[in-house]
């Protein structure tokens, strides 16, 4: 399961890893919370949505974008609260959580750690063989996170076994 965290829009996706670099899209969507609602209400709505997705799709692992300082402290703090809710939902079910920076995801998907949204959306559409690009960008980002993890998981397993 790939998650592009956000409090106003949170991208959620589920993919199935195949042989080699084959990845099959299962589901993609965006959870929206009202920007003017109380923080506690927004976090509750996000929690209910992600828990519903986890219950429905039964993922083995969760990949979440690591938040980084974007200049607006309030936005970063709200996103951090959301990430806490997302990580907790996974932890309550014993699901491992892997965090990836935006540049790690961009590099894995496009080969360029500085790829823009348009390039990333085009690449994820092509990689997954989608008829049309996922919208909004949060949905495409969630798919990119899931694919990134599928492709990196074998390397993580090798690295962890060598410890």
UniProtKB/Swiss-Prot annotation:
GO cellular component, one term: cytoplasm
Annotated residues for binding of Mg(2+) 2: 65
Keywords, in A-Z order: Cytoplasm, DNA damage, DNA recombination, DNA repair, DNA-binding, Endonuclease, Hydrolase, Magnesium, Metal-binding, Nuclease
Cofactor(s) it depends on: Mg(2+)
Catalysed reactions, semicolon-separated: Endonucleolytic cleavage at a junction such as a reciprocal single-stranded crossover between two homologous DNA duplexes (Holliday junction)
Active-site residue list: 4, 65, 138
GO terms, molecular function: crossover junction DNA endonuclease activity; DNA binding; magnesium ion binding
Gene3D superfamilies on file: Ribonuclease H-like superfamily/Ribonuclease H (3.30.420.10)
Pfam families documented for this protein: RuvC
Gene Ontology biological-process entries: DNA recombination; DNA repair
Subcellular location: Cytoplasm
EC number(s) from the headed UniProt entry: 3.1.21.10
Residues annotated for Mg(2+) 1 binding in this entry: 4, 138
Record text on cofactor binding: Binds 2 Mg(2+) ion per subunit.
Superkingdom classification of source: Bacteria
Ubl conjugation listed as a keyword: no
Similarity field: Belongs to the RuvC family.
Subunit structure: Homodimer which binds Holliday junction (HJ) DNA. The HJ becomes 2-fold symmetrical on binding to RuvC with unstacked arms; it has a different conformation from HJ DNA in complex with RuvA. In the full resolvosome a probable DNA-RuvA(4)-RuvB(12)-RuvC(2) complex forms which resolves the HJ.
Role this protein plays: The RuvA-RuvB-RuvC complex processes Holliday junction (HJ) DNA during genetic recombination and DNA repair. Endonuclease that resolves HJ intermediates. Cleaves cruciform DNA by making single-stranded nicks across the HJ at symmetrical positions within the homologous arms, yielding a 5'-phosphate and a 3'-hydroxyl group; requires a central core of homology in the junction. The consensus cleavage sequence is 5'-(A/T)TT(C/G)-3'. Cleavage occurs on the 3'-side of the TT dinucleotide at the point of strand exchange.
Protein name: Crossover junction endodeoxyribonuclease RuvC
Gene source species: Corynebacterium diphtheriae (strain ATCC 700971 / NCTC 13129 / Biotype gravis)
